[in-house]
Amino acid sequence: MPGRTAPTRSEPVPDRAEARTRMVETQLVARGIRDAAVLDAMRAVPREAFVPDALAGEAYGDGPLPIGVGQTISQPYIVALMIEALALRPGDRVLEVGAGCGYAAAVLARMGVQVFAIERHAALGEAARARLAALGLTVSLRIGDGHAGWPEAAPFDAILVSAAGSTIPEALKAQLKPRGRLVIPVGPPGGQTLLRLTRRGRDRFESRDFGPVSFVPLLRGVGTADPV
């Protein structure tokens, strides 16, 4: 009897497609996520492709998971909340700071926006680039210090920061277009708040608080080439 070929990491399997649908309905819609583009993208992107093989069975759980070098893939609801807060339209130019395993960048790319992503850990960044390419998603990703943003690609319609800053980096604020949105967790461990800044003028920003969150810190510089 011929053997059955196992699906690759880049090919969603039926039971995991069902798990994605359950995740969207029970974790996102039930908590108030309404942006259809966000929901559709998170139904489509295989989260199991962005976690270590040993944790693939937990990919659709309601919480973060470790991805190596002290970093995590965020809880699905938090990813959805942050991306919904960006209020994106197709074709928008979006910068993600702290790309990690590449999952949020994949969701953004699936939504039809132009994605630029920065990751300070080379091992994570290179692995994320490979995953995104395997899924046929177009993301410009580089290894670097997220505090500096990506001046050569600026200005951006939206910036997503997937790590908590003690303050909001001025370089990121400067790289927003007029009416551009910056979503970032701010504060010390145990006291972080998710904020959205909307640029209303050269040096004028409107702020909205989305409540308490918990993220790894936004660090300066480029990380060591530790194995993932």
From Swiss-Prot:
List of catalytic residues: 74
Pfam families: PCMT (PF01135)
Domain of life: Bacteria
Reactions performed catalytically: [protein]-L-isoaspartate + S-adenosyl-L-methionine = [protein]-L-isoaspartate alpha-methyl ester + S-adenosyl-L-homocysteine
Subcellular compartments: Cytoplasm
Keyword Methyltransferase: yes
GO MF term (any one): protein-L-isoaspartate (D-aspartate) O-methyltransferase activity
Keywords assigned by UniProt, alphabetized: Cytoplasm, Methyltransferase, S-adenosyl-L-methionine, Transferase
UniProt keyword annotation of Lipid biosynthesis present: no
Gene Ontology CC terms: cytoplasm
Alphabetical GO biological process terms: methylation; protein modification process; protein repair
Signal sequence bounds: none
E.C. no: 2.1.1.77
Classification via InterPro entries: PCMT (IPR000682), SAM-dependent_MTases_sf (IPR029063)
Described function: Catalyzes the methyl esterification of L-isoaspartyl residues in peptides and proteins that result from spontaneous decomposition of normal L-aspartyl and L-asparaginyl residues. It plays a role in the repair and/or degradation of damaged proteins.
Family (UniProt): Belongs to the methyltransferase superfamily. L-isoaspartyl/D-aspartyl protein methyltransferase family.
Protein's name in the database: Protein-L-isoaspartate O-methyltransferase
Gene: pcm
